[in-house]
Amino acid sequence: MIEIKRIQQQPDLAQAIYAVMAAVYLVSPWTLEQIQADLSQDQTWYALAYDRAEVIGFLAVQENLFEAEVLQIAVKGAYQGQGIASALFAQLPTDKEIFLEVRQSNQRAQAFYKKEKMAVIAERKVYYHDPVEDAIIMKREIDEG
């Protein structure tokens, strides 16, 4: 059974999160040190998806009084398509606007985000590197979760 746990300021879990990134991405977008630093931030929290003791997915969020930004979301390949990303997304606050950025070429992620009531609001040119690509900025309004 998959269990979702919300954590904050637990840099000791960085290795497990990094392992998910390494399994999902060809090259992890963040280093282990960046994840550890992010896990130490006051305004950052993570939702982790566990299969028994193994972290199989996560959602990284930076939140303030008025809004939240999805920094990362990833689920290991063997667990994709089972509703885990939606369960992670369900941890987001419904009383705040939610923002995120996604690669223009990542149509699968964009379709998922639209299913989660996110809408395209802008584009950032040449935002990503390796490869260089534009970012699509998406937003979910308050109470549309």
Where in this protein do the model-derived segments appear?
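Conserved acetyl-CoA-binding loop-helix of GNAT-fold acetyltransferases
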Residues: 75, 81-94, 108-115
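Conserved active-site tyrosine of GNAT-family acetyltransferases
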Residues: 113, 118, 138
